[in-house]
Amino acid sequence: MKKILLVAFVLTMSWHLNAQLNIDSLSHINYQQLHGADLNDVWGYEDEMGNEYAIVGTSKGTSILDITNPTAPVEVFWHPGTESIWRDPCVYGDHAYVTTEANDGMLIIDLSPLPQSTNLPVSVYTGPAGQTWTSAHTCFCDSQGFAYIFGANRGNGGVIILNLNADPMQPVEVGVFDNWYCHDGYVRNDTMFLGHIYDGFFSIVDVTFKANPQLLATQVTPSLFTHNIWPSTSGQYVFTTDEVSGAYIAVYDISDLNAIHEVERIQNSPGAGVIPHNTHVKGDYLVTSYYSDGIVIHDCTNPENLVKVGEFDTYNGQTTGFDGCWGVYPFFTSGTIVAADITEGLFILGPTYSKGSYLKGNVTETGTNVPLGGVEVTLFNNPQPDNTNNSGDYITGIYHTGQANVLFEKVGYAPFSTTVNLVQGQEIVLDVQLTPLPPFNVQFNVTDASTGSPIFDAKIKLVHPLIVHQGATNALGEEQLTLFYQEPYEIYTGKWGYMPYCSSQTIDPSTGVINVLLQPGYGDDFELDLGWSINSTAQTGIWERGVPNATSSGSTVQADVPWDCGSSCYVTGNDANLHPDFDDVDQGNTVLVSPPMDLTGLTNPHFNYARGYYNFYGPQLVDDTLKILVSNGSQTVLMDQVVPPLGDSMQWEYKSIALNGLLPITSTMQISVVISDEDPDINITEAAFDEFYVTNYSVNGLVALQQEIKVFPNPAHTEVTFLGSFTNEDYAMFDGMGRCVQQGVCSEETLTLSVVDLEKGLYLLYIGDSRIRFIKD
């Protein structure tokens, strides 16, 4: 193939200048313009004359670039292939091996004619007769002349071991390790390190005898989606990535294979949900392709104290999805790095490897000298603070030289701040002592608003920026707490058979007692566990209560219902992985069932709730239905259902359904939310459920998206004011049993109502198509 000088496609020293640290842009190749292709992984090759080449896997084939002059790359070879988003190269000697999931087999390229000739011989390998395979996820070539194929479409998709020594163009299969699917791996000498992504762990395997690999150890990783693994230069540690939103680069001490343990973890952009992809060890540094954060370099001189010392953002934006830098190769003799960004092309980069500044020490209690574990240590506004261990020891670091502030914080202790003088490449020792805060006590009394009787086992959740307490009342309706912070707290209280309560209150030593009145009724905003049960046969996507995690396709809700208490709801599967097919309902059903309800005292009972549903994609029929059932203890009927396909982003829908006419009303009424995705027609199937409550009337037409309403005071004693734009709007106020206690028409934009004559408890005010809760104390 004729060499192509990439003048038209090279941009030098101009890419994302505001998102780089110790890495310079040397050139950039736009593969959309060159081949109309996205990029996958990348590897490197050096010929006998020292020329350097990038071997680039693209969605439409394999490209080889001469990058000996990194500011003027030249494409010297192009081999088209079946389109695929996975194409992964590795190199042994003078041969490149390229796997793909496009059923093209493994492409083998003879690189030995370079640089004199670009007419490079190729062959395709698909395995021995009777044991063929045509696709694989990745590959790796060790230093002893063996290639390791990961994730092939044969068996479990484990590891296939090929001997390249006799004829590199015609490999010979010599071994298999097929205990689990393997996504990626690394081999040093006779030890194989494997990432089992769908099983959530890594394994270490002895491959001294290639025909008989021996499992040595396994270890789960933080997000249970182990994508990539690489050992330290010393072999004492391994570094791993989980390919999920907000995951970590994690470090494990493997010096004792019977006691592997995590010693460090780090994120590049805490709180942003960015996904790490592939990490590589280069001496005392980790070089990681980090999707929408580009590439990141960490100083791993001490693997138990990773310090970010370099970054280059290849992707113009930051997402929680699979956008940005897929692969990176940092092993050229020249030091040049090549980074493959999926949509933005290939970046040729010049790094400056620099050391971090390190800080360590011990934290004890003032007066007693007792070591303090769990102390948060924040160095120079580092968004990833360290924590002391049980012995009070900490170690941290940052890329900074000179004066730096250090903040030490622990619940129950006064924070301590000081300044240290950091020196690049050196470890400074700083021991400190923390002084205990004076504790104070507060007591919660939870009583029935109608009878004044104490409520046993009422759930209490207290939320402060530094603590979350969850407890329950005793037989006297009391719970006593010891607190340290004289600050505002969020308070959530509830029990099945009562309407939920939430408020915000400053608690200090003068507070003494907090009285909470719960209004009889049935309601649940799912901030507390009030006893709903879950029955499931599904393998994934089981109902769970929590703050919903979004997916990349919008297949679940972004947040709970906006106007109820707290931020939790029930969702089917709530893993942080953004892929919509990772934790959706599969291979069975999952059923959410309420505790029983005595509704015999209501004349017109209605079940009110918010639901979300998504059912789309899949190679077969999109055929799953969300069903909501009502039971009276002896009879069950279908009350509500949603049929597919529903491919738009999941949104909350509000329902108010009359029970009269469906079945007799009893003292053992229950609601069930049923969703399933059965073989063989597996789809992406998700559901969400929130803000359940029972009324003695219909709220249809009153549950549209609310305008923002401000209410004060809340709780109210004599009168309550609602701020909004309510002129000429109808309003109605209901107690927890669904009885209308006030109604009328707003004459002004704000609405002020007297509540002097109302019983204590929770009330709902409807104004037009809006509503808000408030408490009468």
PLM region spans:
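C-terminal outer-membrane/trafficking sorting elements
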Residues: 6, 376, 703-712, 716-777
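Extracellular glycan-recognition surfaces and repeat-rich motifs
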Residues: 42, 522-581
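Residue-level detector of functionally pivotal "anchor" positions at catalytic/ligand-binding pockets or at interdomain
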Residues: 349-367, 435-443, 521-525, 586, ...
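Structural motif
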Residues: 359-374, 443-456
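Short, acidic Ser/Thr/Gly-rich low-complexity loop/linker segments typical of extracellular
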Residues: 368-373, 378-399, 454-456, 464-480
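Short Pro-Gly-centered beta-turn/loop motif in secreted/extracellular proteins
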Residues: 393-405, 411, 478-490, 496
